[in-house]
Design a protein with these regions (language model features):
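N-terminal secretory/membrane targeting signals
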Residues: 1-31
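Hydrophobic, small-residue-rich transmembrane alpha-helices and their short perimembrane loops
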Residues: 30-274
Length: 274
């Protein structure tokens, strides 16, 4: 009989072997996007400007978008809020921060597994040079950092918005109350797009054309890995909040959608996520 560790090791080895067999069979049949070579951006022009100039101007547009998002962040942070509401929102943020730290460790463990597959596929099966493989590995980390950083920013600004929205709702004015979460969503959206585009434009502008393909492949893998892991675990995290809300109904003997239960929104969100 195998021990628990031996069974887990054997199962992982079987998974790796299956993946390698699949990759070895697919490698001769398909070309890789990592082999794409970008043209010289200075050789084409639009409206009297070279392609390089237009993309370089795009970086400034993206940076302006990032500044726009940070301005909304500062506005939300400086809004008035009751001390009790602020205390609750900060407690929620500390809980979310613990979740993000744990999730970051999990993503890095998952990345080690994915990176080993990338090394085997691109280095052994596709016969890429060492520098190309290292570029793919490096930019996969850049992609993960982009997803993870924006996720952290989103949780931080949403906990700001929660307490400020609750305090503004005491005045009974719908539009000013509605504008607060709307600003939070705009801030996250503009910052997300701006950060991702700045990285992609930097690859187009400052990385040699023959190395841009590996950079984009690594960046896409990292972004997808980070976003998928955060989304799946985030759904589980939301479901935990849903269960916590249901438990509070039992403890305090309140109905399903009782306004006295502050976990009603978490309950509704968790039900939809489930």
């Amino acid at each position: 009989m195998f021990s628990f560790v031996e069974r887990k090791t054997l199962k992982l080895a079987m998974i790796m072997a299956t993946i390698l067999v699949m990759l070895s069979g697919a490698a001769p049949a398909f070309a890789s996007e990592a082999e794409l070579v970008l043209p010289d951006l200075t050789s084409v022009s639009f409206f009297g400007m070279t392609g390089w100039t237009i993309l370089f101007l795009g970086i400034f547009v993206c940076l302006a978008g990032a500044v726009f998002g940070m301005v909304f962040y500062k506005q939300l942070r400086d809004m008035p809020v009751h001390s009790s509401m602020l205390e609750v929102s900060e407690l929620i943020y500390e809980t979310c921060k613990t979740y993000l730290q744990t999730q970051g460790k999990f993503i890095m463990l998952l990345w080690v597994f994915i990176a080993s597959i990338m090394v085997v596929y691109f280095g052994w099966l596709r016969h890429f040079s060492i520098d190309r493989v290292l570029l793919i590995i490096f930019f996969s980390l850049v992609g993960i950092a982009g997803s993870y950083g924006v996720a952290w920013f989103g949780i931080r600004i949403n906990t700001f918005a929660n307490s400020r929205t609750a305090f503004a709702a005491l005045k009974g004015k719908p539009f000013p109350t509605y504008a607060i979460p709307l600003k939070a969503g705009i801030s996250i959206g503009t910052l997300l797009i701006s950060v991702e585009l700045v990285i992609m434009l930097a690859i187009l502008l400052f990385v040699p054309g023959e190395y841009a393909g590996p950079c984009f492949i690594g960046f896409a893998i990292g972004e997808s890995l980070g976003a998928a892991a955060l989304r799946i675990a985030g759904g589980i995290f939301t479901k935990i909040a849903d269960i916590g809300s249901d438990l509070m109904k039992i403890v305090f003997d309140v109905k399903e959608d009782d306004a006295r239960n502050p976990g009603v929104i978490a309950d509704c969100t968790g039900d939809n996520a489930g």
